[in-house]
Every structure is written in structure tokens, then in C-alpha cells.
Amino acid sequence: MHKSFIAIAIGATLVTGTLAGCSTSDTKVQNVIAIQTDNPLLQASTLQYQTPDFSVIKDEHFKPALEQGMAEHYQEILTIANNPAAPTFDNTIVAMEKSGALLTRASSVFYNLTGSNSNPALRKIQGEMAPKMAAHSDNINLNPALFARIDSLYNERNNLGLTPEAVRLIEVYHQRFIMAGANLTDEQKVKIRALNEEQSTLTNEFSQRLLRLTKEIAVVVDSKSELAGLTESDITAASNDAKAAGHDGKYLINITNTTRQPVLASLENRELRQRIWEASANRGLSGENETASLVSRLAQLRAERAALLGYENWATYRLAPQMAKTPEAVYSMFGSMVPAVVANTEKEAADIQAMIDKTGGKFELAPWDWEFYAEKVRQEKYALDANSVRPYFEFNRVLEDGVFYTLKELYGVTLKPRPDLPVYHPDVKAYEMFDADGSSMAIFYADYFAREGKRGGAWMSSFVGQSHLEGTKPVVVNVMNIKKAPEGQPTFVSYNEVTTMFHEMGHGTHGMFSKVTYPSLAGTSVSRDFVEFPSTFEEDWAAHPKVLANYAKHYETGQPIPDELLQKLLKSGSFNQGFDTLEYMAAALVDMEWHSLSPDAPLQDVATFEANALKKHGLNISAVPPRYKSTYFAHAFPGGYSASYYAYMWSEILAADAFAYVQTQGGLNRDIGMKYRKTIREVGNSIAPMEAYKNFRGQEPTTEGLLNRRGLKQTL
């Protein structure tokens, strides 16, 4: 997942409702400066590429830096908006690109840490700042004088003698200001400000509750015997987690961010499997940290906001600037796949039920049984035991000999450790990226291990964005939640985690390879349904024979994974794809249905709404619930993927088509890798996404590659 923190857009004032307000008083600005001279966030870091100096940044620095940043930024915006000179590209658009340096710097660090290394102090600041940041965004986006200048330039954009990238930037600004409400009446602007403030407050509260829920719903297990099926390493980790949580002598199973839980594939105790699954699936429905009420209200207020802006619903509003363009296009894409996906899923369910019956189970398949018995089916069908593969996927080897190796083979880049650079947690490692000619390109932070204070999932984000205009090079981070082994033991990753490591590096290189002039167009600043293309494309290299042979080696002997075992692993790649695809589609369509509500629709009962949405689309298979239920659907509600979770599959169509094309061009080689790097990853949003894709591929994508990738084509 690409995590687009608001800091990336602040300098360009291209945010659409998640920034905030501050005083416009010059005296206030001067007073804040006088008081905060010892705050390291007030000046650009002197470390390479302005990498944040985490050794001196403290929690108490953030709030004053954010408030001063907003004050300075707003003064800069007023200067631009009230400039008596006629609007030009330089005195308006370029000036906006250069504005908000302090706010960008402070917020990029702050919002990265609230996601990956949060604590009560940071969460308190986050709650206080949310409505202020929303107001600040509105103060910019709804400024009539500022929009008049942008509108004037937009109308004359093709007559100004500008570069194609500069014209593209004007178009991006204009569209985002329109979609933020810049051309609304004064009365409508008052209403949209109120809705933006409420949305900001609710999404922040949603995130905070999800973080608290992660700790609250962890399952305490009394005896080791109940954990039969887990490895000794996993049991030791569960014991250590329990001790850290104050449950000495017991075991703790932490719940991940998805409905399905990895531990369910190994646990033999059916009653415990049910406890764990229900803890996951029922989170947020009730209790002090319930999120159901937030889901209903967020869907409602987003519909109200869309109506103010002249759209039928939030989904229509959100998709207008995307590649998909309309909700109907998304429904059509999924609808065309439902028959194949359901057919695969029903066959998988029948195979699993047969395995339950064969092994003496006298019960019908339930959601908490799927993964446990699916693993048995996998072993029988492919003679593949997940534990037999495990010793060949040691974390460091996967990262260095898999992910980093692929980057060098395809794109000519290398990453070297930078232990001298400060990090925000001992588990984080810093690297410097070098191009084939030895020139330095970027700083990369690797934050792969789960810990308290980190939200669930995996994502990429930026501390510093690339820009020729400002002379900045990228500083990016990849974040995951891999379970770290106890001290002194190697950390192993599942094959799913292997592909996620490749996926997030796809986002990372999208940021680090960026070569554009303007920061607002850099790297991952593309549409939601294009941003997942580079990352999904990168996933497929994890299974490339040459790449696998380089990293899939036994952690003790260094011997490569036996060819027989490797072939079993590769052949099993399409196993359970009905389940995997259906649970994703279910979540994506529930997201789309929530955000297709009309503005006059009443508040919805979450469970009833979900059930009706799944039934409507023919995905109501009880043993296969959505990957995320609404109450913990971070992408769609507190995150930036509302009415956009479909984007993963839309992007996968591009990725599968592109990867198939690459194989016709020799596969893993520098020539095709550099073509892809230059036409896709270096250009950011300086070129329209489909135009960039056709520059690489020579044509628009088809769905054939996707169906082959997921092993679904044979069922059509």
C-alpha cells in the first residue's frame, strides 16, 4: 500500500480536506519563532538529503512546529493570492510549489511516526491537530482570489509557452481546487468547511480506536497445549508477547489488520481458532472502541459533501479524476469476474469440506476452518508443507538477495547500509541508494517488524519528496508488520510476506526513481488506481526462477531450495485464488456500496448493510467474509482509499499485462528494466497515467494477464 501522508501535498497546497487552520497574524508567527528557536523541525535538517535527525526530534517539538508551519504557510498563500501583478506560472503555481516548507517538513515526520511508532503523546497531538489541519486546507482551497489566479492560468495554459510538465501541473492544480470546492458559493463553502472538519475529526478518532482495538482484542491462551500446530518459535513469541502484556505464564495471539489470521492455518484447536476469528471479525462492533457509528456517519457526511460539489454520491466524486472514471466501470470490471471467482471459490470450499470429512471432522466448513484445512488440501494436492519451505525464507536474505538483487538486475541500482543515520526505532535500518554510475539517488528506511504503536498492514511513505525545482532527493520508508523472532533466532517470513516486501519496494522505487521538476507531480503522486501498478508489478519478480534461486536458500546451510520443493511452491501459486480474490472483491464492493449512498440516505446498520451489499453482488459465501469488514476497514474509512479499494485490482490488470509483456522482452534484464524505469517510475504524475503506460507497453492493457496471474482463466 502507498501511504500518502498529507505532508507530501502541503507544500503545493493540493490537499482536499485533511489539512488545517491557524492564525494569520504576523505577530503570532514572530512570537512562535521566538519561543521555538531550539526546535529542530524549524530548520531543514543538515543530514544528507534533509533526512530527519531523529536523534534530536522529540514529541513536544511537533505541535509548535505544525502550528508555526501553518501560520507561515498561510501567510505565503495570502501573498500569492493578493499579488497585484497579473497571474503568471512563476508568481502563482511555482510560488505555491515552493510554499509551506516548514509545514511539509514537520508533518512528514509527524504523520509517519503516528502510523509507525505512535504513543499517547503523539496521538493526543494528532487529535488536537486534525480539525486545525482540515481548516488550514480549506483556507487555501476555498480562497477565491487564489483560485481566480489558478483559473486564469488554466484557461490560457496552452498559450503560455510552457513545458508539457508545467501544463500538466496547472491542470492538476485546477482539478483539485475545483474538487475541493473552490467555485462554490460562500454559503456552500461554510457548509463544506463544517463537513471537512467533522470528517477530519472522525477519521482521526477511527484511527485511534483501531490502534486501541489491536491491543484490546488480542487473544489470551492459558496453556501451551492449546497451541498445538504452532512452531516452537511461534509459541515462544506468544509467551513473550503475553509477558509483555502482563499475562505471565500465558500466551498471547495478536490480531492482524485483516479478517483472516495467519495463525489459523496452523492451529489444531478448533475452539481456539473460532475465538481468534471472532475476535478479528467482530472488532469495532461494540464496546468503548466501537467504530460502527463512525462508519455510518462517515459514509453519510461524504455523500453530503459530494452533493455540495455537484456529484451524485461520494464514489462518483472520488472516481472522477481516476483512470476508472466512474463507479459503473468498477462494477463492470468486478461483475465480469464474479462468475469465475465464485466458481473457483465453491470448488475450493468443496475440496476443503471433503478434507474435513476425510479427517474425521463432523461439522460444516466455517470461516475459522478455511485456512487450516486449506493447508491440508494444499499439502495433499501439491505435497507442499508450509513449514518445509519456511527455512528457505529468512528475512535478511529475502531482503538483500531477493528484493535488492532484483533492483540491481532490472534497474542497475544498489542499496548500501547507512548505520550512521539516526533512526526512530532500533528495528529501523537506513540505506543509501546508488545508480549504476555510482551517483547517489536517495535514502531508504526499512521498518519491517511489528511492534506496539504501529498500525497494522504495510505501506510506503516519504520523509522528503523529489523535486528538481527545489533540488531535493527522495527520502522514503517501507513499513511492514513482520513478526520478529525472539533474540538470537532467525526471522522467517511467509511467501505472502515475501511478495509484500517486493510490493512495498515497488512503491519505494516509484518514489526513489522520480525525476520531475515539480514536487506535486513527483513519485507516487498519481491516481489511486495507478499507484498500485508499480508495486504489484514488482511482486511478480519474487517468483522469477533466477530471483528465487538467489534468495531461497536454507538459513543454516546456504543450500538452495530443492528444485522439487520449488516447483511445488510455484505450482501451488494459484491455489486458493478463489478465496483470495473473492475476499478482496467483497471488501472492494462493500467500500463502493458505502460510498454510493445518496446524501439523503439515513444512517445504516453496519452488519445489515454489509450483508445486503454482498448479496447484491453475488458474493455472500458465509465461509469467505470480506478481507476487511467495515468496522476495521482502515483503507476505506480513516485512510485515503474511500471508494478506491478497487484500485488494487485495477492496478493489477496493468501490472499483469506489463509483466507478461516484459517476459516477451527477455524477462529479467537491464534493457527492459530501464525502459520501465524511465517510462513509468521516473515520470511520476508529469504524464497522464494511461499515456505513460502506453509509452512503455505500446498499447492499452487487457485482462488476460490478470486472469492468468490468478489462475482463473480456465474457469471462464
Give each language-model segment a name:
Residues 18-21:
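C-terminal motif of bacterial Sec signal peptides marking the signal peptidase cleavage site
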Residues 483-502:
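Short pre-active-site segment immediately N-terminal to the catalytic Zn-binding motif
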Residues 1-8:
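Bacterial N-terminal signal peptides that target proteins for export
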Residues 23-25:
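Bacterial signal peptide processing site
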Residues 29-61, 68, 250-252, 380-382, ...:
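C-terminal, non-catalytic "cap/extension" segments appended to globular domains
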Residues 46-61, 110-129, 152-194, 254-292, ...:
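Short His/Asp/Glu-rich catalytic/ion-coordination signatures at enzyme active sites or charged loops
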Residues 30-231, 236:
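N-terminal helix-rich structural modules
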Residues 165, 169-170, 201, 208, ...:
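Active-site-proximal, well-structured secondary-structure segments within enzyme catalytic domains
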